[in-house]
Amino acid sequence: MEKITLFHGTSSRIVVPTYGLGEKKHDYGKGFYLTDNLNLAKEWAVCKPDDENGWVHQYKLDTDRLKILDFQEKDVLSWLAELMKHRDASDSRRYRVLSKKFIEKYGIDTEGYDVIKGWRANASYFYIAKEFVRDNIDMDILTELLSLGGLGIQYCIKSRLAYEHLQEVQDGLLSVDYMEFREKYNHRDVSARQKMRELIDSDANKVTNVFSTLL
């Protein structure tokens, strides 16, 4: 039996993880999202610009008998295809047509998995995604771009079994100061975007092996 410690950053003091709930338009669809990085959880707890302190809930996940899909072990295009299933990087007709083809070619069937593990698509990701679908980013620099984003790794609890294996640590609730961690969240995003723009504008970006050529 292997138990891992995970954290859920939120503006809510009371959280009840419930099977079947969650937003369809989150990165991996409906589910309960956590991270194994406490500092990132604190930043995510205050990512909404409402000047309210946040909360971090601590959990233990018993991974015994759980089927986990880890996108870090897959091609980055498979991860992008999964995000395209749930989130729109553009509202253009071109994107709607090409993203469907992209998902068909690179997407993974996630049905049957109890937990999905992978990068979190924050604001920096959407900057990359928009440039990628516009054919402004070469595939050769895509992985490096994503690493510059400091996206962080998240776990999405999907199945009823996974929810049953998730237990909150009763004395693990932490209060998060809005001003301190909102500043860190903003700094991370600004720094990431600056580094991304520099790489996209560099000679390393050949703009040859681009989104539309991968279909």
Where in this protein do the model-derived segments appear?
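A short beta-strand micro-motif
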Residues: 6-9, 55-59
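Short aromatic-glycine-(Arg/Gly/Cys) micro-motifs in beta-strand/loop hairpins
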Residues: 1-25
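Short, flexible loop/turn elements at secondary-structure junctions
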Residues: 10-11, 38, 61-65
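Extended catalytic/binding region for NAD+/ADP-ribose chemistry, centered on the ART fold
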Residues: 23-48
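Short, surface-exposed beta-edge/turn micro-motifs
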Residues: 2-4, 28-31, 54
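Short N-terminal amphipathic alpha-helices
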Residues: 42-45, 52-58
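Conserved NAD+-utilizing ADP-ribose enzyme module
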Residues: 2, 26, 47-50, 62-215
